[in-house]
C-alpha cells in the first residue's frame, strides 16, 4: 500500500503521516517497523530490482544460444513487471533525488548493460539482426516492456501470464506472418 501511495502522489510528496494514514497505523507504529520513509522506498525498489537481477542469474539467462537467453530474459523481466507492478512502476519513476534512488538507478544501469551485452552476443551469433546498435536495441526492447506499467491492469482483459510471451514475440519476431 505504501508503494501505491508513492506512485499516486510521488515519493517526495508523500509524508510519513500520509503513509501511516493509508496503512491504518500511527506514525510511531510505522517508525517501529521502518526507520524512515526512505527505508520503505528501499524495500519497494528491492522487490523490483531483486526480481529483475534474479532473472539474469537463472540458468535460462546464462546457458545456451544468446538469442534464446535474450528471449528468456525479456520474458522473465516482463513476468517480474507483472508480478511486482507497483514496485516496478515506482522504480521507473525514481530520478536520483536521494541516496536510495541513486543506488537503484546504478543497479538499473548495471542491468541495462548486462542486457545490452546479451543483445550484442545474440547479434554476434546471428540470432538477431545486427544493423541496429545493441544499446539502442536493448533500450527499445525495454521501452516496450516498461510501457506495460502504463496500460496493464491485473485482472483486466490482458492475460498477465501470457504477456511476456506476447511482448517477446512481437519484439523479436515482429508482426509479419511470413
Regions found by a protein language model. Name each.
Residues 1, 5-39, 43:
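Helix-turn-helix
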Residues 67-72, 103-107, 124-140, 158-165:
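All-alpha amphipathic helical-bundle segments outside canonical DNA-binding/catalytic cores
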Residues 8-12, 62-63, 84, 125:
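Short coil/turn segments at alpha/beta junctions that flank glycine-rich nucleotide-binding fingerprints
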Residues 72, 78-117, 124, 152:
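Short secondary-structure transition hinges
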Residues 43, 54-83, 134, 138-141:
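Hydrophobic alpha-helical connector segments
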Residues 41, 45, 49, 101-112, ...:
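Amphipathic, non-transmembrane alpha-helical scaffold segments
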Residues 61-64, 109-137, 152-155, 175-178:
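Hydrophobic alpha-helical bundle segments that form small-molecule/ligand-binding pockets
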Residues 80-83, 90-93, 117, 121, ...:
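Amphipathic C-terminal alpha-helical segment
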Amino acid at each position: 500500500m505504501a508503494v501505491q501511495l508513492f506512485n499516486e502522489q510521488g515519493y517526495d510528496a508523500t509524508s510519513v503521516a500520509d503513509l501511516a494514514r493509508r496503512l491504518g497505523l500511527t506514525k510511531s507504529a510505522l517508525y517501529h517497523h521502518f526507520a524512515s520513509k526512505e527505508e520503505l522506498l528501499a524495500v519497494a525498489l528491492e522487490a523490483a530490482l531483486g526480481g529483475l537481477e534474479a532473472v539474469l542469474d537463472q540458468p535460462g539467462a546464462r546457458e545456451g544460444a544468446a538469442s534464446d537467453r535474450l528471449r528468456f530474459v525479456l520474458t522473465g523481466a516482463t513476468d517480474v513487471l507483472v508480478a511486482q507492478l507497483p514496485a516496478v512502476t515506482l522504480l521507473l519513476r525514481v530520478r536520483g533525488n536521494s541516496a536510495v534512488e541513486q543506488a537503484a538507478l546504478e543497479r538499473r544501469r548495471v542491468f541495462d548493460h548486462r542486457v545490452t551485452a546479451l543483445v550484442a552476443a545474440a547479434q554476434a551469433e546471428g540470432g538477431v539482426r545486427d544493423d541496429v546498435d545493441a544499446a539502442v536495441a536493448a533500450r527499445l526492447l525495454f521501452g516496450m516492456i516498461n510501457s506495460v506499467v502504463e496500460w496493464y491492469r491485473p485482472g483486466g482483459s490482458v492475460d498477465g501470464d501470457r504477456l511476456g510471451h506476447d511482448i517477446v514475440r512481437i519484439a523479436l519476431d515482429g508482426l509479419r506472418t511470413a
